[in-house]
Amino acid sequence: MGNPLQISIFLVFCIFIQSSACGQGVGTEPFGRSLGATEASKPLKKPETRFLLFQDENDRLGCRLRPQHPETLQECGFNSSQPLIMIIHGWSVDGLLENWIWKIVSALKSRQSQPVNVGLVDWISLAYQHYTIAVQNTRIVGQDVAALLLWLEESAKFSRSKVHLIGYSLGAHVSGFAGSSMDGKNKIGRITGLDPAGPMFEGTSPNERLSPDDANFVDAIHTFTREHMGLSVGIKQPIAHYDFYPNGGSFQPGCHFLELYKHIAEHGLNAITQTIKCAHERSVHLFIDSLQHSDLQSIGFQCSDMGSFSQGLCLSCKKGRCNTLGYDIRKDRSGKSKRLFLITRAQSPFKVYHYQFKIQFINQIEKPVEPTFTMSLLGTKEEIKRIPITLGEGITSNKTYSFLITLDKDIGELILLKFKWENSAVWANVWNTVQTIMLWGIEPHHSGLILKTIWVKAGETQQRMTFCPENLDDLQLHPSQEKVFVNCEVKSKRLTESKEQMSQETHAKK
């Protein structure tokens, strides 16, 4: 039998396929009760797709837009001069809609500088089915959305290029089917997939899922792609022009599988749904965050995999290799999907600041060492103390190591570093032994770690900096010792100024 974590993941996928993959409807009210709308409270005679428009950020009622009924355009306040954003929810296990829908509606309608029509594709009666049937219904709902947009073109002369579909989980694939169902050469303006569903879509052909061909621009945010037995809640493969993988896309900070058993004891099987919901729905909250914190936009960087990104090797913005996650993404189209990685915080605002550090070590001890380091950073705005450094391998003779550091705060321009070899009882004993042996040597020896240069690149600003030891006469680093590094250019400039001043004083004396 597998370990507890594997068992938990397996249990999650069993629940996903049979009942609640997308964590829809937990702790919410049915649509009619939640909105308080007379129309919404009527029982449906048969499963159907309905469309609602919202007047402002506080609107919880919505107004039903009926294709082939042009009077509803005026009744619902549709403005043909503004873009149309349609939100498409995912699968439902209990026939209820999620509270995040109203949050994203409010965030979109609150942006006064960019007024838009905001609508909801309510396919809850078709989503509240067994997962496999709900998957089949995504194509039907996509065709319904396409029919709505074609009707808007005919009745209101509204261009499909002004349409932005935002689909969560199964809703992402509904968006794709809507785009591929549109007649003619022109395409929908934009589709955003929020952790598009994985089961029954992973590995399928582009016409069987959301793909870059479904709109002029397609972006996707992948937040729960952790696989077990070949399945993942969110689709793992790239399916857009820009595919973002926050924290690698596998799982998200603040969502803990290891606490699943405790949650089950407290909340029953709803705890499993909540655990899935945390990582899967993080895609939604990252998108909402991009609307609510336009001054704190998260940046993703193109990279081949999370391993390379964790080494800080991918913080380049040249040739469109970085982009903004969320609503304000730069809409560049390319022939091949771009995979972008980034780190986020566990809560909003999610933005962090990415730095690549490259450190040149010279190990004068014969054997590889695996010490623990911390680094303190002083910037023009903030100071961060004692950041733990993990190199991932032992330090050998002469090598440069690269790693990624992320900061929750904007510290401004980096002006000083403090690098410390954290002491431990084991390393203290090893070091003392080495020093004792050295004393018996015939010739003088120099032992320890030498730090010559630290190179830094700031991902968000693309600034490159080189830091040199403040004291060039003592480059060795020993256990419990801390070295100060300053900007080499500043240090060089100060030395030059000092020499010039000394020269002037010498001439003055003559």
From Swiss-Prot:
Location(s) in or outside the cell: Secreted
BP terms from Gene Ontology: cholesterol homeostasis; cholesterol metabolic process; cholesterol transport; fatty acid biosynthetic process; high-density lipoprotein particle remodeling; low-density lipoprotein particle remodeling; triglyceride catabolic process; triglyceride homeostasis
EC number annotated for this UniProt entry: 3.1.1.3, 3.1.1.5, 3.1.1.32
Start and end residues of each PLAT domain: 353-487
GO-annotated cellular components: extracellular space; high-density lipoprotein particle
Glycan-linked positions: 79, 398
InterPro entries: AB_hydrolase_fold, Lipase, Lipase_hep, Lipase_LIPH, Lipase_N, PLAT/LH2_dom, PLAT/LH2_dom_sf, TAG_lipase
Disulphide bridges, residue numbers: none
Gene3D superfamilies for this protein: alpha/beta hydrolase, PLAT/LH2 domain
Keyword terms, alphabetized: Glycoprotein, HDL, Heparin-binding, Hydrolase, Lipid degradation, Lipid metabolism, Secreted, Signal
Region Essential for determining substrate specificity, annotated ranges: 255-278
Signal peptide: 1-21
Pfam families named among the record's database cross-references: Lipase, PLAT
Reaction catalysis annotation: a triacylglycerol + H2O = a diacylglycerol + a fatty acid + H(+); a 1-acyl-sn-glycero-3-phosphocholine + H2O = sn-glycerol 3-phosphocholine + a fatty acid + H(+); a 1,2-diacyl-sn-glycero-3-phosphocholine + H2O = a 2-acyl-sn-glycero-3-phosphocholine + a fatty acid + H(+); 1,2,3-tri-(9Z-octadecenoyl)-glycerol + H2O = di-(9Z)-octadecenoylglycerol + (9Z)-octadecenoate + H(+)
GO MF, one example: lysophospholipase activity
Entry similarity comment: Belongs to the AB hydrolase superfamily. Lipase family.
Function: Catalyzes the hydrolysis of triglycerides and phospholipids present in circulating plasma lipoproteins, including chylomicrons, intermediate density lipoproteins (IDL), low density lipoproteins (LDL) of large size and high density lipoproteins (HDL), releasing free fatty acids (FFA) and smaller lipoprotein particles. Also exhibits lysophospholipase activity. Can hydrolyze both neutral lipid and phospholipid substrates but shows a greater binding affinity for neutral lipid substrates than phospholipid substrates.
Record's protein name: Hepatic triacylglycerol lipase
Natural source organism: Mus musculus
